[in-house]
């Protein structure tokens, strides 16, 4: 069986309370990704590459992604509330629940990653599963805004930050792991700005031109994914625009 209500030798991966998935699921997921066709040479939003990035990093450093990011970034940045699998570190009262999952786990997802694929990877994934708060994320985005430096410590080379936060291909609004502006206005985010939005209702944005860091955290999937008014009404983007209009002359 793929799933078990109890943890045993064959079912060690916990996807939520009282549900464990077979250990071989990770190899199955990677095999499916390896076998997937490349398709046409056009832009397509996909998480598949980030599954592979995680596997590559863990192989190179000999540590899981959670341990690696804690040691390389989060602890020295003072991001003490940022982690994968937060139930292992914090009480449930300190963790916000997300969706009542009717298609996979059949319960309120609380303390576990919302993304089903990341859940199958044990909650530590390259594309989803990171829990944090606004203060920690402000530190991370400020480090990016500083060109990879924070608190007199260098985490990334300036050219690395510049490469990942620039528009990668003509005709789309993506950097490497970051969003870019599709269009810009006189009063609003600059072309140099970059950030990221999350499915559960989050947004981080940094603008080197105006020295602005914007953090928006919401819980729009609690308790259901639809209707997605947050995206339809562009709440995150509209609040960001109000900030620019209040600051810029």
Model-derived features with residue positions:
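Structured C-terminal helix/loop/strand segments within mature extracytoplasmic catalytic/sensor domains
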Residues: 197-249
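Short, surface-exposed loop or secondary-structure junction motifs
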Residues: 1-192
């Amino acid at each position: 069986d793929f799933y078990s209500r109890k943890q045993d030798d064959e079912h060690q991966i916990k996807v939520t309370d009282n549900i464990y998935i077979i250990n071989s699921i990770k190899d199955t997921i990677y095999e499916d990704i390896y076998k997937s066709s490349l398709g046409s040479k056009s832009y397509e939003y996909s998480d598949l590459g980030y599954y592979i990035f995680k596997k590559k990093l863990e192989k190179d450093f000999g540590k899981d992604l959670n341990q690696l990011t804690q040691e390389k970034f989060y602890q020295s940045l003072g991001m003490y509330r940022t982690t994968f699998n937060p139930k292992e570190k914090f009480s449930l009262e300190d963790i916000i629940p997300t969706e009542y999952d009717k298609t996979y786990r059949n319960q309120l997802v609380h303390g576990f990653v919302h993304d089903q694929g990341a859940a199958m990877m044990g909650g530590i994934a390259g594309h989803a599963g990171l829990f944090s708060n606004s203060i920690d994320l402000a530190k991370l985005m400020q480090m990016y805004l500083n060109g990879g430096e924070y608190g007199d410590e260098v985490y990334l080379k300036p050219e690395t930050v510049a490469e990942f936060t620039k528009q990668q291909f003509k005709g789309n609004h993506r950097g490497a792991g970051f969003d870019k502006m599709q269009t810009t206005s006189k009063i609003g985010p600059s072309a140099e700005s970059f950030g990221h939005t999350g499915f559960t209702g989050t947004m981080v944005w940094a603008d080197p031109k105006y020295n602005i860091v914007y953090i928006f955290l919401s819980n729009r999937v609690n308790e259901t994914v639809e209707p997605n008014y947050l995206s339809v009404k562009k709440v995150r983007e509209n609040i960001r625009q109000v900030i620019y209009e209040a600051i810029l002359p």
